[in-house]
């Protein structure tokens, strides 16, 4: 009977080293060992590992969903299928397209040739319900059209209190003030537009949300109160005054709202503002044209140099 025994190591020969094992990429270090751990596993643990390995199944990766064909089609005006459904006020079709495109921000915020998104068109056509579904699906309230108007600008300009309410209710509080203060390419905020059109309910709602009653147009510095005086809208003046505007704020030309009442027919507006305006801003400033005419000499130095001009042999007299 043969017994298993470890083979004897070859005797060391002086001046001769035993051969070293090699591995791919270089020699193995003397103490390098590789232990899978299988030898130290119990029989039951080993069988459990085998069963788990046998249960592994690789599922084939599903191909990415192909976009709907209708989502890629555009008209010559740059309108998508959703733009058209909203323009033609096809409510059921619009809602179905919105449902299928939910979360697709690129499609929902696509701008046509007038830079209008579906949300712009929903507001223009006064479809507040469609606007609400668009916002829930992921439409952006900050996108501007070719005039720089956001959907909220348009809603305020049209006086649609329902659309204004829907748009602002789906806006986070920290973002709402930025939306209210946004100006279009004419420099008008939403409050300016509602004031110009005289929509008192919209004006009051915007002010209740925190719209800046003292916001100035960048072109000439008029506030909503200046605009109300220009429009001779006494009801709007009364509404704005209730919300504590700075009645002494002047335009870039230096005019207070009270000073704009001079020469106007509506005396009640002048009476409302007179008690609130400081005395120095109740008097009209002197015209710059009058001041310049008084200070400038009748002739310039260049004109006085040529005092011997003749036409047709006759000397000109100044």
UniProtKB/Swiss-Prot annotation:
Record region (Disordered):
1-44
Coiled-coil ranges per UniProt? none
Modified residue Phosphotyrosine is at which positions?
46
Swiss-Prot/TrEMBL ANK repeat ranges: 114-143, 147-176, 186-215, 220-249
Q: Where is the composition biased (Basic and acidic residues)?
A: 17-44
Keywords (A to Z) from UniProt: ANK repeat, Cytoplasm, Isopeptide bond, Nucleus, Phosphoprotein, Repeat, Ubl conjugation
Q: Which superkingdom heads the taxonomic lineage of this protein's source?
A: Eukaryota
Q: How is it modified after translation?
A: Phosphorylated at Ser-36 and Ser-40 by IKKA/CHUK and IKKB/IKBKB; disables inhibition of NF-kappa-B DNA-binding activity. Phosphorylation at positions 36 and 40 is prerequisite to polyubiquitination and subsequent degradation. Monoubiquitinated at Lys-21 following phosphorylation at Ser-36 and Ser-40. The resulting polyubiquitination leads to protein degradation.
Cross-referenced PROSITE patterns: ANK_REP_REGION, ANK_REPEAT
Where does the record put the Glycyl lysine isopeptide (Lys-Gly) (interchain with G-Cter in ubiquitin) cross-link?
21
Residues modified as Phosphoserine: 36, 40
Intracellular or extracellular location(s):
Cytoplasm; Nucleus
What are the recorded Gene Ontology BP terms? negative regulation of canonical NF-kappaB signal transduction; regulation of fibroblast proliferation
One Pfam entry for this protein is: Ank_2
Q: Which Gene3D superfamilies match?
A: Ankyrin repeat-containing domain
Write one Gene Ontology MF term.
protein sequestering activity
Tissue-level expression reads: Highly expressed in lymph node, thymus followed by liver, brain, muscle, kidney, gastrointestinal and reproductive tract.
Q: Which GO terms describe its cellular component?
A: cytosol; nucleus
**Which family is it part of?**
Belongs to the NF-kappa-B inhibitor family.
Describe its function.
Inhibits the activity of dimeric NF-kappa-B/REL complexes by trapping REL (RELA/p65 and NFKB1/p50) dimers in the cytoplasm by masking their nuclear localization signals. On cellular stimulation by immune and pro-inflammatory responses, becomes phosphorylated promoting ubiquitination and degradation, enabling the dimeric RELA to translocate to the nucleus and activate transcription.
Q: Spell out the protein name for this chain.
A: NF-kappa-B inhibitor alpha
Q: Which organism is it from?
A: Gallus gallus (Chicken)
């Amino acid at each position: 009977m043969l017994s298993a025994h470890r083979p004897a190591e070859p005797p060391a020969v002086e001046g001769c080293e035993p051969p070293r094992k090699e591995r791919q990429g270089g020699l193995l270090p003397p103490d390098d060992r590789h232990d899978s751990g299988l030898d130290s596993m119990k029989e039951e643990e080993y069988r459990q590992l085998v069963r788990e390995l046998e249960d592994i199944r690789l599922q084939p990766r599903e191909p990415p969903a192909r976009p709907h064909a209708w989502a890629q089609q555009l008209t010559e005006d740059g309108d998508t299928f959703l733009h058209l459904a909203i323009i033609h006020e096809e409510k059921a079709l619009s809602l179905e397209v919105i449902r299928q495109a939910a979360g697709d921000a690129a499609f929902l915020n696509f701008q046509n040739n007038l830079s209008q998104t579906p949300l712009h068109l929903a507001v223009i056509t006064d479809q507040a319900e469609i606007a609400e579904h668009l916002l829930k699906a992921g439409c952006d309230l900050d996108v501007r059209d070719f005039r720089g108007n956001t959907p909220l600008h348009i809603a305020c300009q049209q006086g649609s209190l329902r659309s204004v309410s829907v748009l602002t209710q789906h806006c986070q509080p920290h973002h709402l003030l930025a939306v209210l203060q946004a100006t279009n390419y004419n420099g008008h905020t939403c409050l300016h537009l509602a004031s110009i059109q005289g929509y008192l309910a919209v004006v009051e709602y915007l002010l209740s949300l925190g719209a800046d009653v003292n916001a100035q147009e960048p072109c000439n510095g008029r506030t909503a109160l200046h605009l109300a005086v220009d429009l001779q809208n006494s009801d709007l003046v009364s509404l704005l005054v209730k919300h504590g505007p700075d009645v002494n704020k002047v335009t870039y030309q230096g005019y207070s709202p009270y000073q704009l009442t001079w020469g106007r027919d509506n005396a009640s507006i002048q009476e409302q503002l007179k008690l609130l305006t400081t005395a120095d801003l109740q008097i009209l400033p002197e015209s710059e044209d009058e001041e310049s005419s008084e200070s400038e000499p009748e002739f310039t130095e260049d004109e006085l140099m040529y005092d011997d001009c003749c036409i047709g042999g006759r000397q000109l007299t100044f």
